[in-house]
């Protein structure tokens, strides 16, 4: 279940990220740790996400969070890149990574295979859509076990 502060944190972080040429990919607030950990995954919209991107986002967001006192008490702020082998789960991620190379694994074979590679075109209630060398593929959503970014780049 999503922490109730997440929407407010996203509202604060998004304009900061946009000003830096970044995008918020995921926000997690781990309140079961002491002190609690607020983790944001970011990506650079124009180049590979680097340490400088994480540092700039961290400094800017920390100042804003401290000024608003949204999070009471002490907490740890972690800013990182989601990484190339990231598993996609949310609608937001499927939109953000449209056009990226992905690997789709299915629970049971679909058209005689359990692993598909191609460029992500999107997903809806019925299917995950790929483009594999110009061929459109729609994999039924109920068969999809996971979708992750392809770090092998062999499509």
Swiss-Prot record:
One of its GO terms (biological process) is ribosomal small subunit assembly. It comes from the Bacteria. InterPro entries: Ribosome_maturation_RimP, RimP_C, RimP_C_sf, RimP_N, RimP_N_sf. It is found in: Cytoplasm. GO terms for cellular component: cytosol. Coiled coil: none annotated. Keywords: Cytoplasm, Ribosome biogenesis. Belongs to the RimP family. Required for maturation of 30S ribosomal subunits. HAMAP family: RimP. This is Ribosome maturation factor RimP. It comes from Gloeothece citriformis (strain PCC 7424). The lineage of its organism: Bacteria, Bacillati, Cyanobacteriota, Cyanophyceae, Oscillatoriophycideae.
């Amino acid at each position: 279940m999503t922490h109730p502060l997440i929407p407010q944190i996203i509202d604060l972080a998004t304009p900061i990220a946009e000003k830096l040429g970044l995008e918020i990919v995921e926000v997690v607030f781990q309140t079961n740790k002491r002190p609690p950990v607020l983790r944001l995954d970011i990506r650079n919209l124009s180049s590979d996400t680097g340490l400088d991107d994480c540092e700039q986002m961290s400094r800017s967001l920390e100042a804003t969070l401290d000024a608003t006192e949204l999070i009471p008490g002490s907490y740890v702020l972690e800013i990182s890149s989601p990484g190339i082998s990231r598993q996609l789960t949310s609608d937001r991620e499927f939109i953000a990574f449209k056009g990226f190379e992905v690997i789709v694994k299915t629970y049971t074979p679909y058209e005689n295979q359990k692993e598909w590679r191609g460029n992500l075109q999107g997903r809806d209630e019925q299917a995950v859509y790929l483009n594999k060398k110009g061929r459109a593929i729609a994999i039924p959503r109920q068969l999809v076990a996971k979708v992750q970014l392809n770090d092998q780049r062999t499509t």
